[in-house]
Amino acid sequence: YESDPGTPIMKGGRVAVVGGGNVAMDAARTALRLGAEKVYIVYRRSLEELPARREEVEHAMEEGIEFKLLNNPIEILGYQNPDDRRDPKNGFVTGMKCIRMELGEPDEKGRRRPVPVPGSEFTLDVDTVVIAIGTSPNPLIKSTTKGLEVNRKGGIVVEEATGATSREGVYAGGDAVTGAATVISAMGAGKAAAAAIDEYIKGKEA
């Protein structure tokens, strides 16, 4: 661990985190710790539909994060100086346009589908937007690694006990295998894969 890794961190003053899962809660709370003056969580469903763990939501609320529920972003607004293409402010976020939602009929998973409310658009005054609406494995992994089997969601298929993939000598674990899960789960998969890799190398050297 390095206290100063040398990589600058852009700190937002007013931050919008889009999403309602554990990663969204982590991102919002981290933004506060980095010095943001205001942090919003923007989620298109209601509090009851938030997929994040209850304790994560409660901690975020206790820390002063404002929840913009039943709202959905439709456009990220940015600064553009028409007279100076080299203006260093060009491309910086100036706000996020949203629309209010209401819950309609249930979808195929039984969750009530959010429906836009016509004419309810508004602009949220933010200078930073963090998108935290889900995770999926990078499709480049499969296309650049011959012989690697993936499931229909793009997750790498492995032997559960060892992390061994369909390609000899290649091991995988964490979200690239299971989809969005916890750091603890990924660490466990990493330890199992490390032990299996050690045995694999020893077998090659014998």
Language-model regions, residue ranges each:
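Rossmann-like NAD(P)H-binding beta-loop-alpha module
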Residues: 2-36
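Cofactor-binding loop segments of dinucleotide-utilizing enzymes, especially the Rossmann-like FAD-
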Residues: 20, 43-46, 175
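A structured beta-alpha segment of the ubiquitous adenosine-cofactor-binding alpha/beta core
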Residues: 5-6, 70-74, 79, 87-127
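Rossmann-like dinucleotide-binding cores of NAD(P)H-dependent redox enzymes
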Residues: 28-75
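A conserved FAD-binding loop/helix module that cradles the flavin
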Residues: 27, 176-204
